[in-house]
């Protein structure tokens, strides 16, 4: 099976078919972070200073003081491309599986539209997974992992602690041994007042790796605090600590050189992923068949960046050599 007619997607199709379904709305909420899409370049996050003393005795004239200062943090953007290729035989088996899993497709009449939808779904899955991996585990220096297209959140956590020691995020160089419940407890109790005060807004979240997530799951199960029939989907329950959601960050088989276990408490609005598909001259998403190599090929070019808005709103633990959970 080959892509007989190459397909180049226009701007609206790029947004509506590839990026918005994977990184906007419910999808962004599930990721637990803030996503900015197609913001003007350079991409900046406005940070307004706060004035908690707004009320004044009434008199004529203006008593509001000077205008509030506007601070902006720029998100460094990098241009990336994602490419994949399949032999005609492999491409057929992959696409055919996607098609047959759809109840709306008549296998006796596979139209071009059905095939195109399947091709789009295949590429979108791969693209979303690759962006997710780079967003969390990327390191341009290549020290954390072999994913080096951009510097992701985990590497930025460690760099922020190195730059500002007063951040209540502890980076442990040696292997630790402690109960999993103590990890969450200390992340909360050690958090500064500014971070704890944000709990009332409902946006605090714990980001943990799969190993800590599983250990906490089994810990709650041993206490009889998890209803395995009603609180999870496919064996993955929705966990929380004192009402704060716990989001699992799987490495998807990626081997990390350090930061092998982590538990980070922050506000979900504090971690920003910026995506831009409009302001790069080489922007494109296309699919085509290469007759010389007999391959179906797919490519996307876009801009991406990840940033921590306020490193002081971080708390928790990063274990470079892992943690022995008891």
Where in this protein do the model-derived segments appear?
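Sequence/fold signature of self-assembling virion shell proteins
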Residues: 2-53, 150-182, 213-326
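C-terminal interaction module
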Residues: 183-219
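Assembly/oligomerization interface modules of large self-assembling protein complexes
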Residues: 17-100
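Short coil/turn segments at secondary-structure boundaries
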Residues: 96, 135-141, 200-209
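Alpha-helical scaffold segments that mediate packing/assembly in large oligomeric complexes
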Residues: 103-190, 325-326
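Short helix/loop capping segments that flank catalytic or ligand/cofactor-binding pockets
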Residues: 94-95, 132, 215-217
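Extended, non-catalytic structural segments that build the interaction scaffolds
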Residues: 55, 59, 107-110, 266, ...
């Amino acid at each position: 099976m080959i892509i007989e007619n190459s397909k180049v997607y226009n701007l609206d199709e790029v947004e509506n078919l590839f990026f918005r379904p994977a990184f906007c709305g419910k999808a962004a909420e599930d990721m637990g972070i803030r996503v900015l899409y197609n913001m003007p370049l350079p991409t900046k996050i406005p940070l307004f200073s706060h004035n908690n003393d707004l009320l004044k005795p009434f008199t004529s004239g203006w008593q509001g003081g000077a205008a509030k200062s506007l601070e902006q943090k720029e998100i460094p953007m990098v241009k990336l491309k994602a490419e994949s290729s399949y032999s005609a035989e492999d491409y057929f088996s992959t696409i055919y599986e996607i098609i047959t899993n759809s109840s709306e497709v008549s296998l006796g009449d596979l139209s071009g539209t059905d095939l195109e939808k399947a091709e789009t779904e295949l590429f979108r899955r791969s693209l979303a997974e690759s962006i997710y991996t780079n967003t969390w585990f990327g390191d341009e220096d290549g020290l954390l992992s072999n994913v080096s297209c951009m510097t992701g959140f985990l590497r930025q956590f460690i760099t922020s602690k190195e730059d500002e020691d007063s951040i209540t995020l502890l980076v442990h160089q040696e292997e630790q041994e402690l109960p999993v419940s103590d990890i969450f407890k200390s992340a909360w109790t050690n958090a500064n007042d500014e971070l704890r005060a944000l709990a009332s807004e409902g946006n605090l979240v714990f980001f943990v790796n799969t190993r800590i997530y599983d250990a906490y799951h089994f810990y709650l199960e041993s206490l009889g605090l998890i209803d395995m029939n009603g609180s999870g989907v496919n064996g993955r329950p929705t966990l929380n600590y004192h009402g704060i959601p716990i989001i699992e960050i799987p490495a998807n088989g990626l081997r990390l050189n350090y930061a092998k276990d982590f538990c980070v408490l922050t506000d979900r609005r504090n971690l920003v992923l910026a995506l831009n598909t409009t302001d790069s001259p080489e922007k494109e998403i296309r699919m085509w068949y290469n007759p010389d190599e007999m391959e179906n090929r797919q490519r996307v070019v876009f801009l991406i960046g990840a940033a921590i808005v306020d490193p002081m709103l971080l708390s928790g633990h990063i274990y470079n050599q892992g943690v022995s959970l008891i």
